[in-house]
């Protein structure tokens, strides 16, 4: 699948959509590559040089958090989240479109609420002054990705609602239209 950062949304919303797409792609690519390099370097260090990298596990933990929460936004952008669509699929197109707007707005609201609670949690962690044992980084710093991921995911769902309100088709995300890519998927 070729990744494009262009948006079908007009004006500022299109720029926001494109910016989020670029951020997601960069964070995911950087996170996966750094995790692979760190793991390989740790294995080589352990078996060839006889010493592990002392901060390897902590770095991978940070990268897992980054990849997870950048990944939820990426999945929303590409309409790859699990959907319970048994009732939805039976509805006529007009009702499906309205339902998609409601689903997108409600999901965005929950994502923004989770962003708020994650930010509050980070505040409580910051006040405790805990640090990672090996890297000596404050614990709250590695959790920054949690509200950032929830915020980007909420923005994706909000932009999906806007896309459905401003376009004639039914969109599962800002650029993924409802339907089957392959006619064979319809056969049972």
From Swiss-Prot:
Tell me what topology the record assigns in the membrane. Answer: Multi-pass membrane protein
Q: Does the keyword Nucleotidyltransferase apply?
A: no
Which key words are in the record? Answer: Cell inner membrane, Cell membrane, Membrane, Transmembrane, Transmembrane helix, Transport
Q: A GO molecular-function term, please?
A: transmembrane transporter activity
Under the heading InterPro entries, the entry gives:
DctQ, TRAP_DctQ
**What other comment is given for this protein?**
Transport is enhanced in cells that are grown in the presence of ectoine, but not by high-salinity media.
- General function of this protein: Part of the tripartite ATP-independent periplasmic (TRAP) transport system UehABC, which imports both ectoine and 5-hydroxyectoine as nutrients, and not as osmoprotectants.
Entry protein name: Ectoine/5-hydroxyectoine TRAP transporter small permease protein UehB
Natural source organism: Ruegeria pomeroyi (strain ATCC 700808 / DSM 15171 / DSS-3) (Silicibacter pomeroyi)
Q: What gene name is given for the protein in this entry?
A: uehB
